[in-house]
Regions:
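Active-site anion/phosphate-binding pocket segments in diverse small-molecule metabolic enzymes
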Residues: 2-15, 19, 68-70, 88-90, ...
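Active-site-proximal beta-alpha core segment in soluble small-molecule metabolic enzymes
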Residues: 5, 10-13, 17-20, 27, ...
C-alpha cells in the first residue's frame, strides 16, 4: 500500500473486472468478434493500461482520433486491427493510411479522396462504410448509399472491410432500434458488398439484443462494467475505483462558512476533512450542494460547500474510528458495505456516467491492480 500512499488522487483498474465484462460480451454475442472501444482514454480508465490488459483477448480496438490510434499501435501485440470510429480530417488521412489503420467513410467524396491517397502511397485503404439509419451524425444517407456504394466498389485502392451504423436509443427504444436493424440489413443485402466486419451493436444494444445480426460488436461502457441502460445489469463488474487522500482534518465551530461563495455554513460544531481532489482532477463542480458523498472508513460522508479546483471538504463527524491525514477516501468504488458508482455521481451532477468517467483528468494517476 506504500506506493498508493504516495499519490494524492488516483484511479485503480481491476483487470479481473475487465475480463469478466469481456466474457459477458462473448456470451451475449458468441458468434461475433469484439471491438473494444477505448476512445477518450479508455473511458477514463487509461488508454495504454487498458489496451495492454485487453490486447490478447479481443479482435479489434476502436478509437476516436488519429492520436489515440498512433498511441496504441506500438503496444498492440496480438490484436492487429485498430479502427478510428470518427471522421478524419484531410491532413490526418495519409498518416492513417501509411499505418494500415482502418477508417470510416461516410460519403462518396470521402471515398474518392481516400482512393487517391491510397494510389499515391501504393496502399489499399481499409474502409468501413457508415450508414446513417437514425443517428444524424456521420454516414451515408440511405437514399444515396446504394448508388454511391456501386461507384466505390470500382475504386482500386479501396478495400471495403466493414459496414456499420450506430444506434441513438438502443438503451430504451427497441422499436426504433429494430427499425434501424431492418433498414441496415436491407441496404447491406442490396449493396453487393461482402465485408468481413458488419457492426451495429454498441453496449446497450449488445446487452439487450446481442450482435444485432452483425459479425462484430462494439462494446464501450459495458467493457468497463457500467450499464448503459436504466436497469443495472448485475453481471457487469465496475473496473474502476477512484480514490483520494485526506490532507487536513479540522474541527470547525458553529457558524463557520465552507468554500467559495459561503454557500454552506455549519449549524453545529463539525469535524471536516479536506480531500485532495477537485474539478481540476475531473471531480465535477456541478456536484456542489447536490448531496454528493464520499466513503471514509466504510461510511458515507457528505461534501460541504462548493467543489474547488484541487480540494473538497467533507463532513466526517459521524466517523467514530480514528482518521488521519493521508488516509484513503473512496470517490467511486466500494468500501465495506458502502459503494458509490459513476452512475450515482452522474445523477447528482446532472449528467451521464460516460461524462463522469471520461472527465477524470490526466493528472489523476492510473494504476492496474495486481489481483491475480
Amino acid at each position: 500500500m506504500a506506493a498508493s500512499l504516495a499519490k494524492r488522487t488516483w484511479v485503480e483498474i481491476n483487470p479481473k473486472a475487465l475480463f469478466n465484462n469481456l466474457d459477458l460480451c462473448k456470451k451475449i454475442a458468441p458468434d461475433a468478434e469484439i471491438m473494444a472501444v477505448v476512445k477518450a482514454d479508455a473511458y477514463g480508465h487509461g488508454l495504454i493500461e487498458t489496451v495492454k490488459t485487453l490486447d490478447a483477448k479481443i479482435d479489434a480496438f476502436g478509437v476516436a482520433t488519429l492520436k489515440e490510434a498512433m498511441t496504441i499501435l506500438p503496444i498492440m501485440e496480438r490484436c492487429k486491427m485498430v479502427m478510428i470510429l470518427g471522421a478524419l480530417l484531410p491532413d490526418e488521412r495519409e498518416t492513417a493510411i501509411k499505418n494500415n489503420i482502418n477508417v470510416t467513410v461516410s460519403s462518396l467524396q470521402e471515398a474518392q479522396e481516400y482512393n487517391d491517397l491510397g494510389r499515391t502511397n501504393n496502399k489499399e485503404v481499409k474502409v468501413h462504410l457508415i450508414v446513417d439509419t437514425g443517428m444524424g451524425r456521420l454516414g451515408f444517407t440511405e437514399k444515396k448509399f446504394l448508388r454511391d456504394c456501386e461507384e466505390i466498389r470500382s475504386f482500386k485502392n479501396i478495400d471495403i472491410v466493414g459496414m456499420a451504423t450506430h444506434f441513438p436509443c438502443s438503451d430504451h427504444n427497441d422499436e426504433f432500434t429494430d427499425h434501424q436493424i431492418e433498414r441496415f440489413k436491407s441496404l447491406l443485402k442490396s449493396s453487393n458488398i461482402d465485408p468481413k466486419w458488419i457492426h451495429l451493436a454498441n453496449s446497450a444494444a449488445s446487452l439487450r439484443i446481442g450482435s444485432s445480426g452483425g459479425t462484430m460488436i462494439r462494446p464501450g461502457l459495458m467493457i468497463y462494467g457500467i450499464s448503459p441502460t436504466e436497469l443495472n445489469d448485475p453481471r457487469l463488474q465496475p473496473a474502476l475505483e477512484w480514490k483520494a487522500r485526506i490532507n487536513q482534518i479540522r474541527i470547525l465551530e458553529e457558524g463557520s462558512s465552507i468554500s467559495y461563495g459561503r454557500t454552506f455554513v455549519t449549524k453545529k460544531e463539525t469535524k471536516v476533512a479536506t480531500i485532495a481532489v477537485g474539478y481540476g482532477d475531473g471531480y465535477p463542480r456541478s456536484l456542489s450542494g447536490q448531496g454528493a458523498e464520499v466513503i471514509v472508513n466504510g461510511k458515507r460522508c457528505e461534501i460541504l460547500g462548493r467543489v474547488t479546483m484541487d480540494m473538497i471538504m467533507v463532513d466526517v463527524s459521524s466517523i467514530d474510528e480514528p482518521i488521519e491525514t493521508g488516509d484513503e477516501v473512496i470517490l467511486i468504488g466500494k468500501d465495506g458495505e458502502e459503494s458509490i458508482s459513476s452512475t450515482e455521481l452522474a445523477k447528482k451532477a446532472g449528467t451521464i456516467p460516460w461524462e463522469i468517467l471520461t472527465g477524470i483528468s490526466p493528472r489523476v494517476i492510473r494504476v492496474i491492480k495486481n489481483n491475480r
